[in-house]
Amino acid sequence: MLKYKSDFQGYSCKFSPFLDNIIGCCFNQYYGIIGNGKLSIFSFTESEILLKKEYKTNEAIFDISFSEIYKNYIISCQGDGTIKLWDFSNNNNLPLFSIKQHEKEIWNINWSHLIPNLILSCGSDKLLKITDVQNGKVLNTFNHNDIIYSCNFHPTLSNVISSSSKDKSCKLFDIKSNKEIKSFNSNYEILTCDFNRYDNLIGLGYSNGIIQIYDLRKSDIEVITLNGHNLCVKKIIFSPFDSKTLISVSYDMNVNYWNISYSIPIHIFNHHKEFVYGCDFSLFNKNLISTTSWDNSLCLFNIN
């Protein structure tokens, strides 16, 4: 296992979709409650993680997403409701642009790989927004009844997005018709959601530690329930390589590796000593995973 130790707490980590040895991570001072943020770009080898570029911000950074067009572009979302675009190939420490798209904290941001000029963001203002990065214009706005924690573009349907919320629902929206398609309702807050790239499935992670997976073609009754966390599930991600593999991270400080055909995790990794906030699969190596935590660390490891 490779580990990088920061002086700030880890919030989100993402592998580059273009460069097989590049990963980004955002860290925050004082657990993101007050203080500054850092966007760190790393290169890595089989033996070490190397800091390549670092940007410091006055506000906490809660999530990041690499561009699906330009290999050296990455976008970040802030505690003050701003979105910043960075080019980590140059020596300039200023963003290419900074736009205020939300009135409160932005918790999640994603770049569409099907329509690569679009980004999706959500936040504490209860809003979900589609922004055109070419001009900064908001194209669509959707809402929940409470804080929106997580949002995603559908991997194959360019007009479909998802969002999960403190209001105990996960909603699907059509950005062409500007209408809600479906709502999955729960008795618990839904902190995270992710689409499966190969099957018509969506996974939801709940505040009670449960993960449920739904078939988008069928009813609102879950088809799979995964039990393996003792506290809130902070993030789930399906593997980009197959339909059965999932990783999840939690406030219980564990990283769980699942085959969704089984109700319990195949492996439980407990290398973190604080809440685990971020995780990702490499797009170039099906066994390579990254995690980041409030224990100030970014970790890379091979699941084999």
Task: List where the protein language model places each region.
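Blade-level signature of beta-propeller repeat domains, shared across WD40, Kelch, NHL, RCC1
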Residues: 277-304
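Blade-loop segments of beta-propeller domains
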Residues: 48-74, 104
